[in-house]
Amino acid sequence: MALSERLQGMTVAQALAQRATTDPEGLFLVVDDHRVTYGQVEEEAEALAAALANLGIEQGDRVAVILTGCAEFVVSLFAVAKLGAVLVPLDPRLSPSELRYMLRHSEAACAVTVEIFDGVDYLQRFEEFFPLLPELQYLVTVGEDDLWYDDRIFQFEDLVSAGVGRHFEVSGVRDPDDLFAIVYTSGTTGKPKGVELSHRGLLHAASAAAQAVGLTPEDRVFGVTALFHVFALGPGILGTVLSGASLVLQSEFDPVSALDLLELHGVTVHYGVPTVFGAELREQRRRPRDLSALRIGLVAGAPMAEPLFREVEAELCPRMLSAYSMTETSSIVSVGRADDPQEKRMFTAGRPGAGTRIRVVEGDGSELPPESLGEIAVSGPGLMRGYYRQPGETARVIDPEGFLRTGDLGMLDEDGYVHLVGRREEVIIRTGSKVYPREVEDRLHAHPAVWDAAVIGVRDELLGEAVCAAVVSVEGAIVTAEELKDWCRLTLADQKVPDSVQFIESIPRAGTGDVRRSELSRRVGRGERGPVT
């Protein structure tokens, strides 16, 4: 039976239960030297769900999970699914104000959290949070310590042990279109929004990615360190379950240990953002590993520049695919295929998966013909239910026909492949002409002395907006701003050539790989390392 057919009527909890029934001894998770089977995750998730139910957590309650790449995150995800509750995955790196905002906005009744992360004591942080978050009833901690004097705080292992063999009831019918997760956007252009995703949507995205890379039970998957991200939830965790593959986890990304894991475990499928593959490429050149098992990689979150794409295929992973993903579409919108020619895999974001429809539209919503540049609009099973507690914002972005206005500019070619240009709000208007940052960035990335680059518009009295390039040079390389401008003039129209070039230590990016352009603007405004023009 085709994978898409198996998904009919399936929920997230049922996906794991089916896999654990058919292959209980199959290897699901590899964390350091710890191996966890599908049967073990099913048993622990069932026990944790029972323990949470005994505390009063019920269907529809929001459960925040604030963990790194660990088995406890995966167990928590499926426990929430079994309860019919709603998962709220959050980044442990969030500032106290960001974390408090998301916990309050989601109305989380319970939080599963790391105890210590990057020097931050989360037990201390939540002691401060409790009086400010009246909806928050319980805290479940993953670690060694325990606040024994607080009856609202429990250790993860204790709850799992307490729930073994305990029966729990879930009222109501679990439907694939029920709300399963509220995933917060990265907030690169404003306050984060809570995106409501269904069981069906996440499983659809998982299926699309699994089919694109040809996942099988023999595969070992790597590259979903940020488990709180929508790509990790769908293609990462659920895609692995649907295929019966194994998932190799890393608590925090580090290129040295990442390549060691790829070699040690014979990883065959690698997901990641461009910066991950770039860091691994540099490390592989420094100390080569045997990566002969690696057969395919999938890059999402942000486009990969042509030079890096070619180098990764030549030196790291023999076949790379590109995907277009958004939180609002449960991750995958379109994805390349292994049998696509290299030009399509490199310069496009592939084609929409089964059931997904893509239009390119004018500002008034009218559909444009192929090869026309406009705003990408998407509909299909992966589309969000809406923004949590923001009906006005939901109505603004989803039209009456059920298409999401993504804010991304691009086109569909005659073969149905998606070409991305950039975000609508990122377009620079220089003397009345539109300049798309992606086009200039691609040209800069092609220079051998440029490691990374991002382009923004800055206010200018004469030009309206000037084109400013922020550049990270290759270590040891010497290049000037004028050289880079001349390089751009070889292929770009005059109005697209950067008016200024500023060399900086690093490009600020979100975990998705997207440039944090507001932060970059502040750095450029401060003259970090001094402008070179």
Model-assigned labels for residue ranges:
Residues 351-355, 364-397, 435:
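Conserved ATP/PPi-binding loop(s) of AMP-dependent carboxylate-activating enzymes
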Residues 117-176, 283-284:
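ANL superfamily adenylate-forming
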Residues 4-13, 25-70, 74-78, 95-100, ...:
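Conserved AMP-binding/adenylate-forming core of the ANL superfamily
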Residues 9-10, 24-27, 141, 146-147, ...:
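Conserved pre-ATP/AMP-binding loop-to-beta segment of ANL
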Residues 50, 94-104, 111-115, 270, ...:
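AMP-binding/adenylate-forming catalytic core of the ANL superfamily
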Residues 42-47, 164, 176, 180, ...:
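Conserved structural elements of the adenylate-forming
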Residues 158, 264-272, 281-344, 357, ...:
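Gly/Ser/Thr-rich phosphate-binding loop
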Residues 203-220, 228-269, 283-285:
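Conserved AMP-binding/adenylation subdomain of ANL enzymes
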